[in-house]
Amino acid sequence: IKFYHLNNNSKIQLSKLEIIVEELENYKKQNGLIDFPDMLDKFIESGEAPSLRVIFIDEAQDLSLVQWRLVKKIEEKAQDSYISGDDDQAIYRWNGAHVSTFINLEGERTVLDQSQRVPQKPFALANKIIKKVRNRVEKKWLPKKEEGSVRYCNNLHEVDFSHGRWLVLAQANYMLAGIGNILDEKELYWQRRHAVPRVKNIYEIIQKWNDLKKGVPLHYNDIKKIAAKMTKDNWDPKLFKTIIKDGFYDIDTLKEKYGLKTEAEWDEALDEVGDEDIYKIKKLIKSGENLDKNPRISISTIHGVKGNERENVVVITDL
């Protein structure tokens, strides 16, 4: 509620917010629950701050009001505190970040004036945009020596993703599905941030199958993954159930005792893998993609990727 009054741009009616807060508090009381803000409040009200020589606070522009109260409490018994952040990177106001507290901090201020990441042309564009933001700390800093480039495209189809590592960023999660569809149309190897792509999982099973065919004994856990990608035409499920779960098995033993019926190439043997995935994996291998590694291309929301970096970044400007 306090943040509501401080945030003039709130899109929710105060009456609705009060109902939500009341119902949430009732739910927590009825079920004996506390949440993270409750933990902070309890420590601020009755906790004992430790005596510390120094404290370090990072990404301070993203702290909420209650988190700032926690910092102040800990500072009471600390000899020194170092607080780092950048108000120009404050993109979590929607999540309660109170940037004004960071901007108005008292104490000695040091600006890191040399970027190790940002090339010259992206630097110029970023500074042109950030100057439109009101209530910020003016700061002078320099880009690295590389010139870099800034290009404008009408759509993702115009972007050449064939080389290098990429981030493709959008404002909201609902936009990512459409981005993924376009990357699929372009037959590219990509992933959603923090998610392992399906084709990578399948490719790992393909590699295990190839090892098995070469005579390499595999542990039950790997055998189970291979069997899961075969229909009963290629592996008898009843005989598979008799396998001892802690053992290692070669292909001859699996055929003799445990129901394996084939030594075909992976695209025939792993007949539970869909035709679309088979086509995509073959296409990616032919194009030179290394499916043993994570994809060169990641898609994410702008908020979800904060702190990451790539040599190529595409920003979708749709809202």
Model-predicted regions and their roles:
Residues 13-14, 64, 219, 274:
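Ser/Thr-centered flexible coil motifs
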Residues 54, 61-147, 167-182, 191-200, ...:
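Conserved helicase motor core of SF1/SF2 NTP-dependent helicases
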Residues 120-123, 170-319:
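Core RecA-like ATPase module of SF1/SF2 helicases and allied nucleic-acid translocases
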Residues 149-164:
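Conserved interdomain hinge at the start of the Helicase C-terminal
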